[in-house]
């Protein structure tokens, strides 16, 4: 069975849904699209949950009808004034691979990204994305992919995206 992917754009004026199926050769074939007037939103924020849910349902049902199958999950975005971002840096000692070398492993990369996320944020906000910008190994800057390199100290410069917790929760409730 082909993998189905669904995108949902909840805009202030229109809600749009698109359903695609990956073909055997890896291409994405659009099988359904739907749109509905957007109700219950202002400036990207949900102000009337039931009205917004109805708009989402209408757009998804139109796409499902065209595609001929039911949607089980969607990809969507959150935007507007409830989203903000900041830069951060994380630093860890390289644990190595357990074989006597200090080769940087995937686990080391995960640890340094976790360290970079350890920044104070308002309790009303949640980190939704951490985007690695560049890595530094033992003072050598500008490394895009540290995996497999040898070093003792690993640093990561990241861009952290946060959103208002209530906006995230309302968006999830709107889609469910």
Range-by-range predicted roles:
Residues 1-14, 18-176:
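Nucleotide/phosphate-binding catalytic cleft detector across ATP-hydrolyzing
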């Amino acid at each position: 069975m082909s993998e189905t992917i669904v995108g949902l754009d909840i805009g202030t004026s229109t809600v749009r849904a698109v359903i695609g199926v990956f073909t055997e050769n890896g291409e994405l074939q659009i099988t359904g699209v739907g749109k509905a007037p957007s109700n219950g939103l202002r400036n990207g924020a949900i102000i009337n949950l039931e009205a917004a849910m109805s708009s989402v349902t209408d757009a998804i049902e139109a796409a499902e009808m065209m595609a001929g199958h039911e949607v089980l999950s969607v990809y969507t975005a959150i935007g507007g004034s409830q989203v903000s971002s900041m830069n951060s840096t994380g630093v860890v000692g390289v644990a190595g691979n357990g074989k006597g070398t200090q080769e940087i492993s995937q686990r080391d990369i995960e640890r340094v990204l976790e360290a970079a996320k350890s920044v104070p944020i308002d309790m009303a906000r949640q980190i939704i994305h951490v985007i690695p910008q560049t890595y530094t190994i033992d003072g050598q800057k500008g490394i895009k992919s540290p995996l497999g390199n040898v070093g003792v100290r690993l640093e990561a410069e990241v861009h952290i995206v946060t959103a208002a917790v209530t906006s995230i929760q309302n968006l999830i409730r709107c889609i469910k």
